Each structure stands twice: as C-alpha cells, then as structure tokens.
Amino acid sequence: MHPFSVGTFFKHLSVSPPKPSVLKPISKSLVAVASAAPPGTSHFGALNSHQKQQVHVYIDSLLQWNQKMNLTAVREESEVMERHIEDSLAIIQPIRNSYVSRCGASSENLKIVDVGTGAGLPGLILAIACPDWKVTLLESLNKRCQFLEHVAGETGLSNVEVIRERAENLWQNQNFRESFDVAIARAVAEMRILAEYCLPLVRVGGLFVAAKGHDPQVPLLAISLNYTRNK
C-alpha cells in the first residue's frame, strides 16, 4: 500500500479569484494526515456487492482503454487495485473527518470537484463508494473525458459529471466559482499551484484536499501551506 499525505485547506474567507502566482502569508487552516490502511486492511472489502462490481467494471475499462491511450503506467489488475483503488478509498475517511472538524457540518451530500482527474482517480472511486456525494470530474483532455463518460455510463453512476476544461479557466465561470464543498487534487502540480487552481472553486467554509502519494514530502507540504491567494 502506498501512503498518502493529505493536506487540507479550510477556506474561511471570501476572496476574489487569484492572479497567477500572486501569494501572501497564510490565512487558511491545515490538517495533514497519513491515510494508508494498515497492512492487511482492505477498504475495498468494506464496499457492498454492487459497489465492488462497479469497481471491477472500472478496472476492466481502465485496462482496456489503456491499451490505446495513456491513462496509467499500471498494467496489472492487482496493481490497479493496490495503487489506485485502495489509495483512492483510503482518503475518504480523512476527508470526512476534516470536513466535520473544520467546517462543523455533516460530510453527507457533499459537492466534490476532482481537479485534473485523469483516469478518474480518485473522483470516480469516491463516487462509487459515496453515492450521496455529487462528484465533478475536471479534465482538460478530450480522450480522457470520453473514457470517464464511458465508465460513468457502464457503472450506472448518476452522481458524476464530467467537465472538459482547465482548472484555471473553470473558476472564471460563475456557475462553478466557489460552488464546491471540497476540491481534491492528486499529484497534478506543485502544492502552491494546486492551491491557486483549486481554492477559487471551493465555497467559503469548504475544503481543499491535496493528496500526494508515494513518498510524501511532509516538509515541502508544510512550507507550501504557509501561503494562500492574494485578493
């Protein structure tokens, strides 16, 4: 199991969308947790039979589509389960805990945006495991969006929306700016850049969760959290 370090920003001030790379000293809160399961623990095993079937449909589709396009470097089903499925499922409880403790609200019926979702990780897996969450998958590449829409259709997920757009453009749309309870990004850019992309999408009182897997660098994470967006 490859551990995640999850950095969680609590958005408590209403701010204007940022100009690129304009940062100032901190005004957000942080929770950093390790979300890897103990050896022998299976988050997949806690899913119901229907959810497990949906995950298998996802894995089959991922491996098939991966033969004609670059979705993941992983080629074996067992490795997909370990590196992608279990890792994605492992961040659910930290997200719930952080949302309840930081936002003082229920972690049910959340509006989630997965920024730079790629192959739908972790967003599609979160949508399967948490059917009460409304998950928006944000991806800029058309072929990947086609894959995401295919999987959403094959798995029968009604709580998933696929949007083809870049994060730095989406927040300029009034329909999406500050409209999500939680924004999630997984290893798509440096922490500071992730914050600039994701924070404009999060409502006041919401969370930005940065999941950095495979040898998480806690000092770098801590340094990055000393900055937030300028007005």
Identify the function of each model-found stretch.
Residues 62, 126, 212:
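Residue-level signal for inorganic ion chemistry
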